[in-house]
C-alpha cells in the first residue's frame, strides 16, 4: 500500500473535510470546491488524514510542508543515533588511589558525551556483601554528578552489580569550554625527569 501523500488532483474522493490555510475548520465540502479554494489562494490541497471518513485535507504550501517534514525526520534520526557506551570495572574493596583513577576515566567518558556502564566485580565471599557494591556505585554517582547522572540505578547482574551513567546534555561543549586547546584525549603527558634538562646559565 502506497504511503505517498496525495496532493491536489491526486485526491480522488467525492468530498473532504477541509482545513483552511490558517488552521480553521471549514467543514465537509466537495472535492471540486476544495480544489478551487486552494487554487484561488495559490496553495495546494494536501491530504493529511487519508484514513478518516471523509479524508481530511488542508490548504497549504506543499513544498514548504515537505521541506519541514524532511527536516524533522533528519532531526529525529540524529536523536536516535546510538550513544557510545563505555565500561568501567571496579572491585568492591577498591583503595582510594585506584578509585580516583577510575573516577577520572568515568569523568572523561562523560565529558566526551559517552554513557558509562559501571560494573562492580564480586569475588568469593564478597558476593555475600552486595551493600559494598551498592555504596560504591552511589558514591561514584554523587562524585561525578557535575558531569552526568544515574540513568539506570544499581542492580545485581549475576555475580556483578551494574549502574549506567549518562552525560548531561551539552557535555562535549562544556568540556571544550573548560579545557580550550586541549586535545580530545585529555591533557598532554607531563615530562619525566629524563626528558628535562637543566637550562644553561
Curated annotation (Swiss-Prot):
Subunit structure: Monomer.
Principal location class: cytoplasm
Feature: compositional bias, Basic residues: 169-178
Region Disordered, annotated ranges: 167-201
Lineage summary: Bacteria, Bacillati, Actinomycetota, Actinomycetes, Mycobacteriales
SUPFAM superfamilies: Translation initiation factor IF3, C-terminal domain, Translation initiation factor IF3, N-terminal domain
Segments forming a coiled coil: none
Function of the molecule: IF-3 binds to the 30S ribosomal subunit and shifts the equilibrium between 70S ribosomes and their 50S and 30S subunits in favor of the free subunits, thus enhancing the availability of 30S subunits on which protein synthesis initiation begins.
A GO MF term: ribosome binding
Protein name from the UniProt record: Translation initiation factor IF-3
Pfam families the record matches: IF3_C, IF3_N
BP-aspect Gene Ontology terms: ribosome disassembly
Keywords per UniProt: Cytoplasm, Initiation factor, Protein biosynthesis
GO cellular component: cytosol; membrane
Domain of life, source organism: Bacteria
Keyword Acetylation attributed: no
Family: Belongs to the IF-3 family.
NCBIfam families: infC (TIGR00168)
Subcellular location: Cytoplasm
Database matches in Gene3D superfamilies: Translation initiation factor 3 (IF-3), C-terminal domain, Translation initiation factor 3 (IF-3), N-terminal domain
Amino acid at each position: 500500500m502506497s504511503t505517498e501523500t496525495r496532493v491536489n488532483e491526486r485526491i480522488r474522493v467525492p468530498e473532504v473535510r477541509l482545513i483552511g490555510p490558517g488552521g480553521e475548520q471549514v467543514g465537509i465540502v466537495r472535492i471540486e470546491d476544495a480544489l478551487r479554494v486552494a487554487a484561488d489562494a495559490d496553495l495546494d490541497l494536501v491530504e493529511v488524514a487519508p484514513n478518516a471518513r471523509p479524508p481530511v485535507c488542508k490548504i497549504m504550501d506543499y513544498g514548504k510542508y515537505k521541506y519541514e517534514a524532511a527536516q524533522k525526520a533528519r532531526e529525529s534520526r540524529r536523536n536516535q543515533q546510538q550513544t557510545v557506551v563505555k565500561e568501567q570495572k571496579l572491585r568492591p574493596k577498591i583503595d582510594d588511589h585506584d578509585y580516583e583513577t577510575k573516577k577520572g576515566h568515568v569523568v572523561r567518558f562523560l565529558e566526551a558525551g559517552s554513557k558509562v556502564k559501571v560494573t562492580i566485580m564480586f569475588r568469593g565471599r564478597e558476593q555475600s556483601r552486595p551493600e559494598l557494591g551498592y555504596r560504591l556505585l552511589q558514591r561514584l554517582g554523587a562524585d561525578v554528578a557535575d558531569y552526568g547522572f544515574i540513568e539506570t540505578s544499581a542492580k545485581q547482574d549475576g555475580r556483578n552489580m551494574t549502574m549506567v551513567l549518562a552525560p548531561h546534555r551539552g557535555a562535549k561543549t562544556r568540556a571544550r569550554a573548560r579545557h580550550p586547546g586541549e586535545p580530545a584525549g585529555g591533557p598532554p603527558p607531563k615530562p619525566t625527569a629524563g626528558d628535562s634538562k637543566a637550562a644553561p646559565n
